[in-house]
């Protein structure tokens, strides 16, 4: 699945996918080369670079380029490769109680999770794009094309080691 959205910055388009694009926090292309078919997006006139995230990409446009024309070209290419775009909207982040007493930690990748075991485990769950760990709880945000219906059981199982309480209602 994929979807394209506008950002508040007119020189940026956001691509959302259900495919993991990188394990790095941000992987910039170039110098890296994205896998097919995203590599072909760099051939579209007006796209300067692509920043890959776990389940999405930021398409950075050249100043003065036509975002509407670029959007059309991106959509045409991705429809041929991946089929029609999804209209799914992002589910809100959820909070889960955890036995953590340290300082606030934010991670958007396994790399950012460092050696913190709760954060590392959460990034083993498909769909997780951000986790914010604070004393007593962790906020978990999913990629736009994932739903809590699909992912919640895996998050609970990950946090379900003995001693982990139930979900805190937002």
Model region roles, listed by residue range:
Residues 29-36, 108-124:
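N-proximal, solvent-exposed amphipathic alpha-helical segments enriched in charged/polar residues
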Residues 13, 55-62, 136-143:
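A generic structural motif
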Residues 74-102, 169:
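Surface-exposed beta-loop interaction hotspot
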């Amino acid at each position: 699945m994929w979807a394209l959205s506008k950002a508040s910055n007119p020189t940026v388009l956001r691509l959302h996918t259900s495919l993991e694009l990188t394990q790095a926090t941000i992987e910039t292309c170039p110098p890296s080369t994205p896998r097919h078919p995203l590599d072909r997006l760099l051939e579209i006139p007006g796209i300067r670079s692509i920043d890959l995230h776990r389940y999405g990409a930021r398409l950075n446009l050249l100043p003065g380029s036509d975002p509407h024309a670029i959007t059309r070209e991106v959509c045409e290419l991705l429809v041929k490769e991946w089929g029609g775009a999804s209209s799914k909207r992002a589910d809100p982040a959820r909070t889960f109680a955890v036995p953590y007493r340290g300082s606030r930690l934010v991670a958007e990748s396994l790399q950012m999770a460092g050696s913190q075991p709760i954060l590392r485990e959460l990034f083993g769950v498909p769909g997780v794009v951000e986790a914010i760990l604070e004393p007593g709880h962790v906020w978990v945000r999913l990629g736009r094309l994932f739903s809590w219906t699909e992912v919640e059981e895996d998050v609970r199982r990950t946090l379900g080691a003995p001693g982990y309480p139930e979900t805190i209602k937002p």
